[in-house]
Amino acid sequence: MNQASIRRRFDRAGATYERAARVQKLVATRLAALCPGEIHGNVLEIGAGSGLLTRELAPRCHGGVYVALDLAPGMLAHAAMPGARKVAADGERPPFRPATFDFLCSASAMHWYADPAASIAANLRLLRPGGGFAIALYVEGTLWELAEASRATGFGSVYPMRPAAFYRELFANLPGVAATVSEETHVVTHASVGAMLRSLQGAGVTHTPGKKAASPAKYRDFVRYYEERFSREGRVATTYAVVMAHGVRKRTATERL
């Protein structure tokens, strides 16, 4: 995983993310509904981006610091986050000690992790015993229409997401963690294939491991294929598959005494 490439793309999207991130706004709202109405103590948000989830949760927080961490300084520079402390850092290597936070949240970010099994486990160790968490990330099935059109025409490529079962197993086997995991699917439509691609670019969702050289002919083939296969009432569809996980870091027998 090229974290520098991911950071550059989101840095460039800092000024356009809010307008383009339609499904990310929906996912942030859905995740916020799984979070407590009041959150006490220190909070860490990983992948805070432009503040979509931050603005939902920061007003609920009392008696601590709300830390909004993101890999891309360019995103944080454009982010409106009243009441939050911005930190530019990699979520896989956060600059905090274990048992620092009372709540951890992340929307539309951890699927970019190079090693999600190790990194999510490490992230949850940042929680104090009894601390809660809520995480939303994208899984296999996201942008499947774009992936099919790319394979058929040779234009572009799609970042390979892990299957939902990977995360279900991960959260089920994390030591000292009790988690509830659910899955959702959301379909977003655009006026044209060009508008869809511009929206992805505006939201920074352009990193893939295998960029392909694109000719005008391949692009035209891609547009034609996509329109023929995935148009609905004059608009083109894109699908997003989401895993939501929320729960607590359990107290050990010693900590309960």
Label each region the model flagged.
Residues 1-13:
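N-terminal, positively charged/glycine-rich alpha-helical extensions of SAM-dependent methyltransferases
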Residues 22-40:
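Conserved alpha-helix/loop element of class I SAM-dependent methyltransferases that forms part
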Residues 44-94:
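Class I SAM-dependent methyltransferase SAM/SAH-binding core
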